[in-house]
Regions:
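Extended hydrophobic leader/signal-anchor segments used for secretion and membrane insertion
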Residues: 1-170
Length: 170
């Protein structure tokens, strides 16, 4: 290889490494170890139009990411897997611990976590605006989701989670 070829190869390799530091690609495969959804491997696929019940990969925004990390629920940089419960135009309410969507009860929030620490609580009703989504894993009563932190911007959605291999306790 000529000296010019070595210089160009080194330049291209350095440029590639440098550019990779600027971009944070979404993983194509993730492992879920939490009990909110079945433990296992999930493929991360692009999201089209959001649909009720769809399982999403969500990157928690600040200050939620810091809260999750400080409480040791989820380290920073690790995504959440949550289901779509309400979409723009729908009214989501929290009255005491009851969550309703368009007047229908959809679940209950806990007041304290497993370590007896108080959980965040919001009150009132909110009609989701364009660009907002309400995420809740109804099958898991202790899932840390929108019943505690409210609606999230759709910009936090990293993709759709499709199960590849999961293990459900029976």
């Amino acid at each position: 290889m000529t000296r010019f070829a070595w210089v160009m190869a080194t330049y291209i390799a350095t440029l590639g490494v440098g550019l990779s530091a600027l971009f944070h690609p979404v993983p194509k495969l993730i492992w879920n170890a939490t009990a909110s959804v079945p433990v296992g491997f999930y493929a991360v696929r692009p999201v089209g139009a959001l649909r009720f019940g769809e399982l999403l990969v969500v990157k928690p925004p600040e200050p939620l990411a810091t809260f999750l990390d400080e409480r040791r629920y989820l380290p920073k940089g690790v995504p959440l897997l949550k289901r779509v419960l309400a979409l723009p135009g729908q009214a989501v309410c929290r009255t005491d611990r009851t969550i309703t969507v368009d007047g229908a009860a959809t679940g209950e929030a806990l007041s304290r976590d497993r370590r007896d620490r108080p959980l965040p609580a919001w009150r009132g009703c909110h009609t989701l605006a364009p660009g907002e989504v309400f995420l809740m894993n109804r099958q898991s009563e202790d899932s840390l989701d929108s019943r505690y932190f409210g609606a999230l911007p759709v910009t936090t959605i990293a993709g759709r989670a499709d199960p590849l291999w999961t293990h459900e306790e029976r």
